[in-house]
Structures are given as C-alpha cells and as structure tokens.
C-alpha cells in the first residue's frame, strides 16, 4: 500500500531523541502544535519529528475522569513515573528510553486529510521500516490505548497512533515500543487503572489491560533493536518514497509559538490533574 502523503518532495527532520531525562513530554506536544501552525500556514515544509522521553506515562483526557485517579497517579509517582495529560486523542501510554515517538506533520489541504488517511500514512511508513515482519493494523483487545489503528506482529501490539489537528496542520503521532518488555509496560498501566477505578462502574469503558497482548520489536523480531537503528530505517523508508530529508531546528517564530503552546500545556495539566 502506497500513501501519497508520504511522497513529499522534502521533509524537515527535527531529531529530539537524545535530549535526556530533563526533556518533559509536555514540551513535545507544544513542539508539534507550533510546527502544525507553521506547516498549516505554508511557512514550512512537512515535518518529521522524532522524540524520546524518559519514564513518563502520558494520559488522555478521558483518563482524567477516572473516579480515583489520585490513587492511580500516586502509585505511578511512587514507582518513579512522571505523568502528563496530552492534547491529542487516546488513553494512557508508557514512554521510556526504549520507546521511539514519531510525528508526521502535514498541511490539512483544501480537500482535507481525512482521519483514516493520516493513520494509513503512518501505518504504511512503519510497515516499510520493518520489511522482515508482517505488520498488521487493527485493534488489539487487552492492550493499553486500544484503537483501530493499533500496529501488531503476530497479534501482539508494539505501536499506537494518534492525531492532532490545529490551525491548518495535522500531526500524526506514533509511539513504537522498540526494546524492553511490552508486558511490563502494560502492567504499569493495568495497575494504574485498577487503582484509579477501585471497582467502580463508569459510563466510559476503560480498557481491561492484558499485559501479554503487548510486546516490543526486540521481543517480536527476536533480535536486539535500538531506537537509533530504527531512526535510520525511518530515514531510509522516507527516502524510498522519493523524499529529500533536510535536518532542521525551530525558527525564531516557531520558538515563540512553542513557548505559547508549552504554557498552555502547563496550564492544562495544572487544571486537569489533581495536585
């Protein structure tokens, strides 16, 4: 399956994979909003941004409505996890040094990029990055943040996709569990939900996490995979679609927008999470 969204003449490449433990996940969502605005207004070529965060659980808006969320958060914090609420769709996911995040940022054209086209472009890219595997698309029941565009190998989920649209730009974001234990990551989220629900029935159905439904690429391919090696595969896949890659950083105008969006993320988190 080819996706015309991947056949861009030029991609700006912004690599945030090695900024270390002080790199706050709230910053990533602010970066993507700032870049969406640039791409959406025609001031920038499409962007591919790569990012890694240490020991962070990223919650969805729906997670903030859990009846005993303060108990779930306390558990995660005791285990050394930071927590934030993102501004795109979905539910709780785990980020750590073994998880590569990729954002593809496109202009939302006059015809409009429908939601499925954005998801399909990312799924196609990941499949091209992993030619030795049969990557399947479809909800993996029992995984965390389940959705119809879960990516799996042999029925075990290793990646999930979300989208964010703002000011004429579309950010399609994926997390990829590259190495480490997928089941262990899922175990943290299962415990978070169990403590945050404490047996109470809710209108919204939160996922029942079955840890063995999730795995990393290292586990699934039976070979050690690294974030840096997967980044190289991503570059090669984009070039195979005929694109030129242009290493880049934010412009002064983008930094200005970034600081505005970062403050919004800080304010949002202060409002939505119990202190």
Swiss-Prot record:
<comment type="pathway">
    <text>Protein modification; protein lipoylation via endogenous pathway; protein N(6)-(lipoyl)lysine from octanoyl-[acyl-carrier-protein].</text>
</comment>
<dbReference type="InterPro" id="IPR050664">
    <property type="entry name" value="Octanoyltrans_LipM/LipL"/>
</dbReference>
<dbReference type="InterPro" id="IPR004143">
    <property type="entry name" value="BPL_LPL_catalytic"/>
</dbReference>
<dbReference type="Pfam" id="PF21948">
    <property type="entry name" value="LplA-B_cat"/>
</dbReference>
<feature type="domain" description="BPL/LPL catalytic">
    <location>
        <begin position="42"/>
        <end position="246"/>
    </location>
</feature>
<dbReference type="GO" id="GO:0036211">
    <property type="term" value="P:protein modification process"/>
</dbReference>
<feature type="site" description="Lowers pKa of active site Cys">
    <location>
        <position position="157"/>
    </location>
</feature>
<dbReference type="InterPro" id="IPR024897">
    <property type="entry name" value="LipL"/>
</dbReference>
<keyword id="KW-0808">Transferase</keyword>
<feature type="active site" description="Acyl-thioester intermediate">
    <location>
        <position position="145"/>
    </location>
</feature>
<keyword id="KW-0012">Acyltransferase</keyword>
<protein>
    <recommendedName>
        <fullName>Octanoyl-[GcvH]:protein N-octanoyltransferase</fullName>
        <ecNumber>2.3.1.204</ecNumber>
    </recommendedName>
</protein>
<comment type="function">
    <text>Catalyzes the amidotransfer (transamidation) of the octanoyl moiety from octanoyl-GcvH to the lipoyl domain of the E2 subunit of lipoate-dependent enzymes.</text>
</comment>
<dbReference type="InterPro" id="IPR045864">
    <property type="entry name" value="aa-tRNA-synth_II/BPL/LPL"/>
</dbReference>
<dbReference type="GO" id="GO:0009107">
    <property type="term" value="P:lipoate biosynthetic process"/>
</dbReference>
<dbReference type="GO" id="GO:0033819">
    <property type="term" value="F:lipoyl(octanoyl) transferase activity"/>
</dbReference>
<comment type="similarity">
    <text>Belongs to the octanoyltransferase LipL family.</text>
</comment>
